[in-house]
Amino acid sequence: MSRIGRLPIEIPKGVEVKVTPDNVVTVKGSKGTLEKKFPPIVNIEVKDNQVIVTRKGDDKEEKAMHGTTRAIIANMVKGVTEGFEKALEIVGIGYRAAKQGKKLVLNVGYSHPVEIEEKPGIEIIVEGNNKIIVRGIDKEKVGQVAANIRRVREPDAYQGKGIRYAGEVVRLKEGKTGKK
């Protein structure tokens, strides 16, 4: 059995988990509601204030989906209670971020500012002009929006300029050594 998959998920107070016969899991909490459909190769049941995930067979695909399904449901429960956040920092002279209504405007060395629209269920906060925080209840969406922001100007390998995750270490390459 999958080591992660066999662990039951405790349902905290104030969280409601429903599973339909066609494997659609709905998690309701104080921060919102999440819904996701899972493949029929896993069984999901709610009993004794716990969510238990089991698999129907022992194929390689079923074993993989067992742990994955359990981890996704655990993240859904955590999302509706605590939420998720990802922080990014902007490094570089003249590089800055600003919030204009529901848009994030990035000035990161291009001839034009780059605008990123705020998606439903995702909140983008700008602290100062070089720190961006992405918050939401869906871990997958928070990570994807943060990755899209980072992709606008990835950290440069020679000077380290660009947008990076908070705490990300960028290894700098050595520049050319000129002839003497």
From Swiss-Prot:
Belongs to the universal ribosomal protein uL6 family. Part of the 50S ribosomal subunit. This protein binds to the 23S rRNA, and is important in its secondary structure. It is located near the subunit interface in the base of the L7/L12 stalk, and near the tRNA binding site of the peptidyltransferase center. One of its GO terms (cellular component) is cytosolic large ribosomal subunit. Disulfide bonds: none annotated. Coiled coil: none annotated. GO terms for biological process: cytoplasmic translation. The keyword Cell division does not apply. PANTHER family: 60S/50S RIBOSOMAL PROTEIN L6/L9, LARGE RIBOSOMAL SUBUNIT PROTEIN UL6M. It comes from the Bacteria. It comes from Thermoanaerobacter sp. (strain X514). One of its GO terms (molecular function) is rRNA binding. Keywords: Ribonucleoprotein, Ribosomal protein, RNA-binding, rRNA-binding. Pfam families: Ribosomal_L6. InterPro entries: Ribosomal_uL6-like, Ribosomal_uL6-like_a/b-dom_sf, Ribosomal_uL6_a/b-dom, Ribosomal_uL6_bac-type. This is Large ribosomal subunit protein uL6. SUPFAM superfamilies: Ribosomal protein L6.
